[in-house]
Regions:
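Beta-strand-turn-beta hairpins that frame and shape the catalytic cleft
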Residues: 2-11, 110-121, 147-152, 205-210
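Active-site environment of divalent metal-dependent phosphoester hydrolases
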Residues: 19-22, 51-56, 78-87, 127-130, ...
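N-terminal active-site segment of His-dependent metallophosphoesterases
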Residues: 1-67, 84, 105-107, 141, ...
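Active-site neighborhood of phospho(di)ester-bond hydrolases with catalytic His/Asp-centered motifs
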Residues: 12-14, 43-48, 72-78, 123, ...
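Extended active-site neighborhood of metal-dependent phosphoesterases/phosphodiesterases
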Residues: 59-141, 183-185, 231
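Conserved beta-sheet core of the metallophosphoesterase superfamily
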Residues: 169-242
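Short acidic, glycine-rich surface-loop motifs adjacent to enzyme active sites
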Residues: 149-166
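A short C-terminal boundary segment appended to hydrolase-like catalytic domains
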Residues: 236-283
Length: 283
């Protein structure tokens, strides 16, 4: 069976927290084995690779991630920016703002109704702060990265763009969430990937599927939420999200219609007159 017969498959990990006292090495080993059997198109690691941003923590998590064979998009989280950890991140993983694109062969492009896919990862962390921020100075760069009109477009950041239920008082949503959401809506982004709260949850906002991932390898869990990570499938008509659990279960969690998404976008329209009269959106 050729790759053209498969949907676009994305593995979403976040909040690994290597160095954390409750870090589960066996859980990480299982993830490596399962991901390598799966062979997704890309792995997105949406921040908090480490517990406190120390060099040894980064080096340990880099060994684990190097064992995963597919291409990776890796961005830091707030824990990774502690103790000047962004220096170690850059040495081991490269730029904190990065892009990965893969073009589809003609058969797969026809099957998926897209020319390829683009993943843009952006660092939402500030050193030694739990709060997140992207910043309007980064918006032109983000806009430039999504340059293929017919791609499946995915944006990744660590901090959540939309509040996550069951996570207590909301204090860590990114500070420019409104401006960023407006930008991503205008760019016709299909999927937003984030982490931070250690709770998996999903929202549909302005036609965007927002996927928050849990922690797959620690016991820093809220309520009865088990460790988990996300597997995302995109085909011509749907986006499906499966949760993988530490006990080996794989559970279908979300089905999003791509056809309905297009209808929602067309049914919700802010007029040019309104936008011209109320120029508050960051460019």
């Amino acid at each position: 069976m050729s790759v053209s017969d498969f949907p676009l498959r994305i593995v979403q990990l976040s909040d690994i927290h290597c160095g954390e006292p409750t870090f589960q090495e066996e859980g990480m080993r299982s993830i490596v084995e399962r991901v390598n059997r799966m062979q997704p198109d890309v792995i997105v690691v949406a921040g908090d690779l480490t517990a406190a941003g120390y060099e040894w923590e980064f080096e340990e998590v880099a060994v684990w991630l190097d064992k995963m064979e597919p291409p990776k998009v890796v961005i830091p989280g707030n824990h990774d920016s502690r103790n000047v950890g962004y220096i170690h991140f850059k040495r081991l993983f490269g730029d904190r703002f990065n892009r990965y694109r893969q073009a589809f062969d003609p058969e797969r492009a026809e099957r998926l109704a897209a020319t390829g896919f683009t993943v843009v990862g952006a660092d939402s962390s500030d050193p030694d702060l739990n709060e997140g921020h992207i910043g309007r100075e980064r918006y032109p760069w983000i806009r430039e990265q999504f340059s293929e009109d017919d791609d499946i477009n995915i944006f990744a950041l660590h901090h959540h763009l939309v509040s996550v239920p069951g996570t207590g008082r909301e204090r860590n949503i990114i500070t420019d969430a409104g401006d960023l959401l407006a930008l991503l809506t205008r760019l016709d982004i299909d999927i937003v990937l984030s982490g931070h709260k250690h709770v998996p949850y999903f929202w549909g906002v302005n036609g965007i599927l927002v996927c928050n991932s849990g922690t797959p390898t620690t016991k820093r869990l809220r309520g009865l939420t088990p460790p988990s990570w996300n597997e995302i499938h995109v085909d011509a008509t749907t986006i499906k999200v499966f949760l993988h659990y530490a006990d080996g279960r794989r559970e279908l969690s979300v089905i999003r219609s791509r056809t309905t998404r297009a209808m929602i976008r067309e049914a919700f329209y802010m007029t040019d007159d309104f936008l011209a009269s109320n120029q508050v959106l960051a460019e």
